[in-house]
Amino acid sequence: MKFISWNVNGIRACVKKGFLDFFNETDADIFCIQESKMQEGQLDLNLPGYHQYWNYAVKKGYSGTGIFTKEEPISVSYGLGIEEHDQEGRVITLEFKDYYFITVYTPNSQSEL
């Protein structure tokens, strides 16, 4: 199985710089992105053969995650169940028959840890 995880720092700008060519060349089974920085309806990606799942931040232009997968999952969940954090679109969990796959975008804690 081949999976890729990439912090794109804004998917719309990344698409303009050749994201789709890279995506197609990788032929990943699962492709995760972090820091999508978009809202629902801002971008329509046509990726034949892939199921798409997005978790958007409430705040415009902030965080967000996405997963593209060839195999359709049994279930999809968004967030951690903690409202304060779930508003930022940082977690997507896919359940498959034999495993779970999770993409997470964690904030930089600076020196606060």
Residue ranges and their predicted role:
Residues 1-47, 57, 62:
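N-terminal, active-site-proximal structural segment of metallo-dependent hydrolase catalytic domains
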Residues 37, 43-111:
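Structured beta-strand-rich core segments of catalytic domains in phosphoester-bond hydrolases
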